């Protein structure tokens, strides 16, 4: 068993010139601090001792690291007078896919000028993310939890490969809810839901909709058009979906079964209403008095 050596700030530091730092916007500076503190926390979780220097305190407090008359990342602790040397620092380079938009937040590869040798595998690691991943792998720790399936993972710095399992074949992802879609057209729909945008407006009543298909369906309520007719009873519907749902009542099909009572329903609306009764949920609230109801029909 190898003893864990003491790690100083120099071992996990990232170096920029003053000119490079000045060119960074607020989001990139925040990203820098987050990456630095994350590297430190990973090493602490693995049992390494981190000497808490003035710089780390500055990072934790979110303070500016450049100060007039001082070099970038120079430790101002009186016990340590020498500035951190460039040869022992880590450079941060952006890695952006060729097909990625320019506005995409950059991912980071922290490259060591002096390779680190893993005691367990004997491999030389040149990236700080590789070092931490190597240490996590040998320790058996899995501190990252997948949002999609709850699976524990050892790779905290690069959870994307696992994430791709859940989004396989779906390359368009909403940056607000993380839901993935197979094409960009389908991605636009949830974005409108988040933003509240309703670009399709009825010229008769001025009611607005997020989708063109919803507008066309609404316009039929003004014209009275019901093109979908049941061959058995003659009842007509605005949408083909409503006709198919109605036809199930003639066939006696009941596709929706309640897990609690075992009761079956031919329509999803009836199934949802039954489920609300079991849960006690009252999602329909009166805007005037605030009283809530389980069913929308009770509210009306």
Swiss-Prot record:
Domain of life: Eukaryota
GO cellular component assignments: nucleus
SMART domains: KRAB (SM00349), ZnF_C2H2 (SM00355)
GO biological process, one term: regulation of transcription by RNA polymerase II
UniProt entry keywords in alphabetical sequence: DNA-binding, Metal-binding, Nucleus, Repeat, Transcription, Transcription regulation, Zinc, Zinc-finger
The keyword Cytoplasm belongs to this UniProt entry's keyword annotation: no
InterPro entries recorded: KRAB, KRAB_dom_sf, Znf_C2H2_sf, Znf_C2H2_type
Subcellular location(s) of the protein: Nucleus
PROSITE patterns referenced in this protein's UniProt entry, alphabetically: KRAB, ZINC_FINGER_C2H2_1, ZINC_FINGER_C2H2_2
Chain intervals annotated as zinc finger (C2H2-type): 172-194, 200-222, 228-250, 256-278
Pfam families per UniProt: KRAB (PF01352), zf-C2H2 (PF00096)
Domain KRAB, residue spans: 7-78
Example GO molecular function: DNA-binding transcription factor activity, RNA polymerase II-specific
Biological function: May be involved in transcriptional regulation.
Family statement: Belongs to the krueppel C2H2-type zinc-finger protein family.
Protein name, entry field: Putative zinc finger protein 705EP
Organism lineage: Eukaryota, Metazoa, Chordata, Craniata, Vertebrata
């Amino acid at each position: 068993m190898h003893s864990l050596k003491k790690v100083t700030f120099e071992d996990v530091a990232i170096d920029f010139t003053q000119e490079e730092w000045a060119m960074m916007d607020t989001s990139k500076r925040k990203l820098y601090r987050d990456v630095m503190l994350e590297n430190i926390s990973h090493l602490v979780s693995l049992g390494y001792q981190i000497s808490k220097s003035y710089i780390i305190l500055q990072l934790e407090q979110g303070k500016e690291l450049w100060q007039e008359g001082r070099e970038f990342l120079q430790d101002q602790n009186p016990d340590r007078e020498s500035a951190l040397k460039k040869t022992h620092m880590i450079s941060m380079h952006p890695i952006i896919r060729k097909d990625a938009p320019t506005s995409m937040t950059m991912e980071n590869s922290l490259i060591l000028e002096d390779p680190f040798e893993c005691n367990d595998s004997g491999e030389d690691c040149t990236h700080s993310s590789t070092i931490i991943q190597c240490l996590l792998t040998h320790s058996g720790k899995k501190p990252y939890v997948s949002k999609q399936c709850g699976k524990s993972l050892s790779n905290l710095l690069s959870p994307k490969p696992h994430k791709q399992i859940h989004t396989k074949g779906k390359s368009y992802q909403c940056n607000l809810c993380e839901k993935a879609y197979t094409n960009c057209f389908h991605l636009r729909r949830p974005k409108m839901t988040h933003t509240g945008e309703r670009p399709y407006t009825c010229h008769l009543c001025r009611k607005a909709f997020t989708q063109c298909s919803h507008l066309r369906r609404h316009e039929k309520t003004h014209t009275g058009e019901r093109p979908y007719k049941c061959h058995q009873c003659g009842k007509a519907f605005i949408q083909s979906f409503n006709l198919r749902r109605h036809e199930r009542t003639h066939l006696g099909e009941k596709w929706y079964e309640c897990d609690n009572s075992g009761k079956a329903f031919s329509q999803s609306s009836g199934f949802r209403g039954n489920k609300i009764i079991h849960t006690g949920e009252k999602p329909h609230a009166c805007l005037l008095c605030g009283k809530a109801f389980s069913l929308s029909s009770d509210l009306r």
